[in-house]
Amino acid sequence: MSTTTAEMSTIDEQADSPLLTGPIFKQFCFLAIPTILGMVINGLYTFVDALFISQGIGAQAMGAVSAVFPIQMILIAISTMLGSGMASLVSRYLGAKRQKDADEVFSASFMLAILSALLLCTLTYLNLNSIFSLLAVPESLQAQASSYITPIVMFWVIGFICNQITEGFRASGNPKAMMQVLSTASILNILLDALFIFVFEWGVAGAAWATICALSIALVIAIQLQSKGESAVKFQRRSLLSPVQVHLKMLSLGLPVLLSHGGFSVILAATVYSISTVFAQNSEPLITAHGILVRCYMFLFLPIIGMMVALQTLAGFNYGAGEFERVKKAYLVACLISTVWGVIVTFILCLNAHWLIALFTSDALVTELGKEIALVAFAGFTTAGFCMMSSGLFQGMGKAIPATMLDAARTYVLLLPLMVTLPNLYGSDALWWSFPIADVAGGVFALSFSIFTLNRLIKKN
């Protein structure tokens, strides 16, 4: 197989990449800080969106959006799975100087993303009423819930495509381009939210249309950046119909992300269902309080996701180059920094939830219920970074099975069973204790398993 001059130039640049030679802490921060900033700016719209809905429309509208939020999250989870699986392969191929393979994977991911989006969104749209029944969405919230989720479902294919391009930037070691796209989408979303909700008075549908319009403009910007060479991988039309094995690799490597993000959606759905059935008398204010706390949690969790994304890229590059000691150092640095952030977030959510909720609503019942939930549910957040960093580590190394196992262990082996058993054994309020127990147990297991695996890898080589 011949190698072109352009490919040789790219290979030489990768061999001299500071990701393979520079100080681990510095390189981790180089990748993490822009990614975190981009995610925080991008995630700000989720926080502000909830704020505008609560203040501009009302607490009931916030409850309606919260009730169907699991649907939106599962769409995001599947999109993220495809992008993360592609990025894991691309970063390892670039680290191993396999430019042609990296280009092929990047290009093939678009066909998989578009087909997945069309199929998933069509099925969801056709079965919305059944999904409402499955989630036990209160009848009083269903009309507004439908107004919000319908535009999201109809046009989320835009989000799938945009995500593939930005993940390509990230896998190339260019998080600044990724941040530019995500930041633009977030800022536009906030501005359009204000316009559609407060000026045009479109209600909860305005929040949904603001998201779709902002994503559309962000996609145009992402395409422009890609065409200008901001990514180390190039789109090749002939690779759209790549062998099935290429798509299967992406799916297998992205599966841990689906289990993690999808697990979050399942937990949200299970919580909404539990509130609607176990706490029937206070279901609406509880769903609203829980929805507000979830938005705050998601915003404060974004730095940990950014660290995981940075670790995945750094570990992928060094693993592909055979630098296993650097892989371990990167993992330990990521765990340390994420733990520090976890302590800060635990303090904010557990001890200061009342002022966070007060930003969204003046309803005394919603505020009191939110304080009671937060004090218990977020007590184990300090260890949350261990699971995420371990998942990012194994994804970067291309080891789908351990990454999948670690994500599944916390959510499906620990949390969901605890959510079912604890309320039956100790009463309805015990539901909230499921979260810190699963966080601590899952985090300790993930940390121990990851260090054991890395030590064995280093010893063998």
Annotated model-derived regions:
Residues M1-A32, V90-V157, L188, V199-L255, ...:
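Short alpha-helical transmembrane segments in multi-pass integral membrane proteins
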Residues T21, F25-L44, V48, I71-I78, ...:
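Residue-level signal for short hydrophobic patches within transmembrane helices
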Residues F30-D49, P151, A185, A214-A218, ...:
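Transmembrane helical elements of multi-pass membrane transporters/channels
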Residues L44-M62, F132-E139, L195-W202, G262-L293, ...:
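Helix-terminus/linker motif at the lipid-water interface of multi-pass membrane proteins
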Residues A59-P70, S146-I149, A208, E284-F299, ...:
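Small-residue hotspots at the loop-to-helix junctions and early N-terminal turns
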Residues M62-T122, G159-M178, V272, H290-F347, ...:
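Small-residue-rich hydrophobic transmembrane alpha-helices
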Residues G83, I152-R170, M178-S186, A207-A222, ...:
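Short runs within selected transmembrane alpha-helices of multi-pass transporters and secretion channels
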